Design a protein with these regions (language model features):
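Non-catalytic substrate-recognition and accessory regions of acyl/acetyltransferase enzymes
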Residues: 2-145, 150-201
Length: 201
């Protein structure tokens, strides 16, 4: 009888295997650690993202329910999942979760980090909404020869037109989400971020 693989140590964090999801990342290790909207380390990475409107401002996460994930070493990465109230959504995808920021400053494949962040999101929040996950990409911020949002497309997202502001809209259907897998823990205690609901079930 095969023994269950033990979590591997990577720095100070315990790396847990991701359960197979049939969507392209089964068996990979979750590298994301749980952060929150008040974490200065996460804010520093957000300040370097092209969609940051007020660099240095304390707030880098939209109001409402959110999940902030961070990688600090050997190179930073940031992911923010947001579940806006459909009553206040102005785009044509009300009900969808939204990735409001993703930045990978390391050498990892961005598509793999995206799938791992999705796995951590469904672990925290439960099954995704029927509308799935949405993200917007500014085509003017990508290299001329690059496909806007290519790493998201590699992770299973599909193009769904444009926002009113001309951003490329990419959507991941609910059926394409990976199986849930918990993020790692780090020094910031996200339990005090009351908007990160359903983290402790």
């Amino acid at each position: 009888m095969a023994r269950r693989a033990r979590p591997r140590q990577r720095g100070a964090a315990v790396v847990r295997p991701v359960r197979g999801d049939g969507g392209g990342v089964g068996g990979a290790a979750v590298r994301w650690a749980l952060s929150n909207r008040a974490d200065p380390a996460a804010r520093a990475v957000a300040d370097r993202h092209y969609n940051r409107q007020h660099v240095g401002a304390d707030q880098f996460v939209p109001p409402g329910k959110c999940l902030v994930l961070l990688i600090e070493a050997p190179a930073p990465a940031l992911w923010i999942s947001h579940s806006p109230d459909p009553r206040f959504v102005k785009h044509r995808w009300p009900g969808a979760w939204v990735c409001t920021a993703f930045r990978n400053e390391g050498a990892w494949l961005s598509s793999e980090l995206i799938r791992e962040a999705l796995a951590a999101t469904v672990d925290a929040w439960g099954p995704p909404p029927a509308e799935g996950m949405l993200t917007f990409v500014d085509p003017t911020k990508t290299a001329p020869k690059e496909v806007p949002g290519w790493c998201f497309r590699r992770a299973g997202f599909k193009s769904d037109g444009f926002s009113e502001g001309g951003l490329v809209a990419l959507v991941l259907p609910a059926r394409r989400f990976p199986a849930p897998s918990p993020p790692l823990w780090r020094g910031v205690d996200a339990r005090w971020d009351t908007r990160q609901q359903r983290l402790f079930r």
